[in-house]
């Protein structure tokens, strides 16, 4: 039974780097957009959902660093940035909203590789633990 649980945990850990990379890729793509469009808002909502999924997956995998909380915050902030962009009536308000969005997206680009690395470290530690257990 413990072996099955450990296997499920490591499978989850092996998927985390791909999810972190997806969050990073989405953040980079959204950063390049310069106009408020329905596609931008939908992209931000997708990014927010993926950041929230990454947060939950990190938490479920037992990553004890602040990363689950950080990605939860990024997901919440992304939704707020989408609302801010939709409410912006003037060029100045739009410029401010885009600046705020880009700051958030830049943070995601910088932090997503840390999430992938933390998951890889945990997967390696889990594999070593299983190897030791099998030898005993």
Regions found by a protein language model. Name each.
Residues 1-11:
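Sec-dependent N-terminal signal peptides
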């Amino acid at each position: 039974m413990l072996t099955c649980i450990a296997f499920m945990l490591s499978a989850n850990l092996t998927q985390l780097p791909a999810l972190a990379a997806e969050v990073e890729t989405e953040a980079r793509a959204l950063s390049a957009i310069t106009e408020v469009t329905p596609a931008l808002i939908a992209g931000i909502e997708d990014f927010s959902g993926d950041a929230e999924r990454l947060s939950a997956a990190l938490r479920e995998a037992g990553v004890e660093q602040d990363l689950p909380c950080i990605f939860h915050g990024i997901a919440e902030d992304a939704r707020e940035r989408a609302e801010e962009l939709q409410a912006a009536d003037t060029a100045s308000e739009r410029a401010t909203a885009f600046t705020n969005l880009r700051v958030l997206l830049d943070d995601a680009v910088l932090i997503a590789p840390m999430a992938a690395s933390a998951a890889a470290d945990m997967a390696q530690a889990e594999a070593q633990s299983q190897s030791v257990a099998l030898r005993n």
